[in-house]
UniProtKB/Swiss-Prot annotation:
Gene: lox
Binding site for Fe cation: 377, 382, 555, 559, 685
Temperature dependence: Optimum temperature is 25-30 degrees Celsius. Active up to 45 degrees Celsius, less active after 50 degrees Celsius and completely inactive at 70 degrees Celsius.
Keywords from the named record: Dioxygenase, Iron, Metal-binding, Oxidoreductase, Periplasm, Signal
Any one Gene Ontology cellular component term annotated for this protein: periplasmic space
Entry's pH dependence statement: Optimum pH is 7 with linoleate as substrate, and 8.5-9.0 with oleate as substrate.
Signal peptide positions on this chain: 1-19
Molecular function, one GO term: metal ion binding
Stated regulation of activity: Inhibited by Ba(2+), Zn(2+) and Fe(3+).
Its job: In presence of oxygen, converts linoleate into (9S)-hydroperoxy-10,12-octadecenoate (9HPOD), which spontaneously decomposes to the corresponding 9-hydroxy-10,12-octadecenoate (9HOD), and into 13-hydroperoxy-9,11-octadecenoate (13HPOD) which spontaneously decomposes to the corresponding 13-hydroxy-9,11-octadecenoate (13HOD). Also active on linolenate. To a lesser extent, is also able to convert oleate into (10S)-hydroperoxy-8E-octadecenoate, which spontaneously decomposes to the corresponding 10-hydroxy-8E-octadecenoate. Is almost not active on arachidonate.
Protein name per the record: Linoleate 9/13-lipoxygenase
SUPFAM superfamilies: Lipoxigenase
PANTHER family associated with the record: LIPOXYGENASE
């Protein structure tokens, strides 16, 4: 019964996540958040009468006021390294009321959760589904009506800004409706858990891939379900998938990856060679050694999912002499060649090697999901932004120009990170169910990756250079790199223009005591590796670019591929139900199918990855307050004037959008994750 109950918890973020305090919080707490936003908005109106200023240029009264505000902020924004399930990682001890999500976010997220409920109910027997379908349909209709009211209120406030105050009463009524809707969503999940637990089974190995397709009841089956076994598609994941940050160019193969010249030529042709490919910059490697305890190699037994496996493979890719696109060459399913044989991509005529090769690719995809979710996604975006959010609130007064700039890029971050720690990472939570490693090892390894992430080395241009993939002449087809640099440079110019408004010289930077305190908190309490004192304007620009890019574009690039690329379990999964293949030959489709995860894992993947990748809240370049009527953040005419820094930034983003759309017409497949129109300003989901 417990096994089935957890299976059904995959319906929509798990029953407790919806019904209890973890995701939507209690109505009273939520109303308190709205009251706090109203207070903050009132203060903001007063602050807007005085342009932001550096502390050294404030008068005595202003300096005392700044100090008082920061003293009170430090009582609310409190560091801890003992947060449940992420111990050792600097986090907020609790989420302040003003950091809870607003009505706009709640409506969007609730809508996606209802979609997931409808999808799950569609897979139930008709007799059981009927009652839930009616309730879910009613919820969908009521949510749509609430969205329409919300949009109408915004339109009225936009057309008549002076009427915004009179609209607050109607907005308060909308809040009450939304709270009631959220309560109904939670009750529906509870009812499904109670009534349907005896109607769902986990399926078995004998039904092939049908059980994985069946979990897409009303949701669209991703295209990857029909292409994931294709070798070119497998290679394309490395440059345009959810984890485009591991592939690196190599001049020689590592000693523990003994691919022979003859094996290479079997794949790339008799007229090519390893030496020639290396010399012409055509060899590219994936090495998952960094996974550590996320790849225990041996069997791991779990109550809910049975036996699971994960490894730290090495995979070689190469470009042909025409550089048309990466091709997989060989895979070693672990770090030790003595225990893991080499799998070389077979020719079409080598049918006896086909399923062994597919099994080796599955081992790579298991490692890929582990690396992506725990390192690239959780550690290097969510948890990095957490540190900068806390430091900003604790050390930069609301009147500081950098606080005004950065705060919108942290909207929702503390809230969603607390949800990740409490819902995704506990024992028997989503990650424990979906991933092979023991949950304690997963928690510790993800935390270690966050603490080891070097801020300056993580900057996009530096990361590309360090991996030897920065030159388009060597690797022409790399959508993440090419589109990412467009967005990076647009943000960098915006940061430079903004800094120039408030910092007349490098001396202004070094004289800024609040900035110095911010740096100190990031280094000391935030434990951001590699961070160092800021001594001039150009360095400040690079730092701001990295902070903004991480919270917005980088998170978008690794988060929003999840629904289309990661919800179909056979294409990628963080655990295998069978060990890595021990021989390239003699394997069958049945052997490969044994590696597929339990249906429980497939359900969990659909629900969590569809949710996380389907909520788009806010947009890069659109700086608005979090409380109704979501007024503009900037009021300083030096920033907002026609042709000024903000308008130029928004114009550049439109140019980037047009360039990417043009590029997509010529690409193997459109890469849409870094379109500025699809990049939220903050990490809020």
């Amino acid at each position: 019964m417990k096994r089935r109950s957890v299976l059904l918890s995959g319906v929509a973020l798990s029953g407790t996540a919806l019904a209890n305090d973890s995701i939507f919080f209690s109505p009273l707490k939520y109303l308190g958040a709205e009251q706090q936003r109203s207070i903050d908005a009132s203060r903001s109106l007063l602050d807007n009468l005085i342009p932001p200023s550096l502390p050294q240029y404030d008068n005595l009264a202003g300096k005392l006021a700044r100090r008082a505000v920061l003293t009170s902020k430090k009582l609310v924004y409190v560091w801890t390294e003992n947060f449940a399930n992420v111990k050792g990682v600097p986090m907020a001890r609790s989420v302040p009321l003003g950091e809870l999500p607003n009505v706009d976010w709640l409506l969007k997220t609730a809508g996606v959760i209802v979609e997931l409920i409808v999808n799950f109910v569609a897979s139930l027997p008709a007799s059981a589904a009927a009652q839930f379908e009616r309730i879910a349909a009613g919820l969908s209709g009521d949510l749509e009506a609430a969205r329409q009211v919300h949009e109408a209120l915004l339109e009225e406030a936009k057309n008549d800004p002076a009427a915004a105050g009179s609209l607050l009463l109607r907005f308060t009524e909308l809040q009450t409706r939304v709270i009631a809707l959220l309560t109904r969503v939670g009750l529906l999940v509870d009812d499904i858990l109670k009534s349907a637990s005896n109607l769902v089974t986990q399926g078995g190995q004998g039904d092939g891939l049908n059980r994985f397709r069946a979990v897409f009841g009303t949701l669209r089956l991703p295209e990857v379900a029909d292409s994931f076994r294709d070798d070119e598609a497998f290679a394309y994941w490395r440059v345009a998938g959810p984890n485009p940050l591991l592939i690196r160019r190599v001049d020689a193969l590592p000693a523990n990856f003994p691919l022979g010249e003859e094996q290479f030529r079997r794949v790339m042709g008799a007229d090519d060679s390893l030496l020639e490919a290396a010399a012409s910059r055509r060899l590219y490697l994936l090495d998952y050694a960094e996974l550590g305890k996320l790849a225990p190699s041996g069997a791991v037994d779990k109550l809910l999912t049975g036996t699971g496996f994960a490894y730290a493979p090495i995979a070689l890719f190469a470009l042909g002499k025409d550089r048309a696109g990466l091709l997989p060459v060989a895979i070693q399913c672990g770090q030790d060649p003595a225990t893991h044989p080499m799998f070389v991509r077979p020719a079409e005529s080598e049918s006896d090697l086909y399923w062994g090769w597919q099994m080796a690719k599955t081992v790579v995809q298991v490692a890929e999901e582990n690396y992506h979710e725990m390192f690239v996604h959780l550690a290097q975006t969510h948890l990095v932004s957490e540190a900068f959010c806390l430091a900003t609130q604790r050390t930069l007064a609301p009147s500081h120009p950098l606080h005004v700039l950065l705060a919108p890029h942290f909207e929702g971050t503390l809230f969603i990170n607390e949800g990740a720690a409490r819902i995704l990472l506990p024992s028997a939570g989503f990650i424990d169910v979906m991933f092979a490693a023991p949950i304690q090892d997963t928690q510790a390894t993800a935390g270690g990756n966050r603490l080891g992430f070097d801020f300056y080395r993580g900057m996009l241009p530096e990361s590309l250079k360090a991996r030897n993939v920065d030159d388009p002449a060597a690797l022409p087809d790399y959508p993440y790199r090419d589109d990412g640099l467009l967005v990076w440079n647009a943000i960098r110019q915006w940061a430079a223009d903004y800094v120039a408004v408030y910092y007349a010289s490098d001396g202004d930077v070094t004289a800024d005591v609040e900035l110095a305190a911010w740096v100190g908190e990031v280094i000391g309490s935030g434990k951001v590796a590699g961070f160092r004192p800021i001594t001039g304007r150009s360095q400040l620009v690079e730092v701001l670019t990295m902070v903004i890019f991480t919270a917005s574009a980088q998170h978008a690039a690794v988060n929003f591929p999840q629904p289309s690329m990661m919800t179909y379990a056979p294409a990628i999964c963080a655990m295998s139900a069978a060990p890595a293949p021990d021989s390239p030959s003699g394997k069958s489709e049945a052997d490969w199918l044994k590696m597929m995860p339990p249906t429980l894992v497939a359900l969990e993947k659909v629900n969590i990855y569809h949710l996380l990748g389907s909520v788009y809240h806010g947009r890069l370049g659109d700086y608005r307050q979090t409380g109704f009527p979501y007024a503009p953040v900037f009021s300083d005419r030096r920033v907002t004037a026609s042709g000024g820094p903000l308008e130029r930034f928004q114009a550049r983003l439109k140019e980037v959008e047009a360039t990417i759309r043009t590029r997509n017409q010529a690409r193997r497949k459109p890469y849409e994750y870094l379109l500025p129109s699809r990049i939220p300003a903050s990490t809020n989901i």
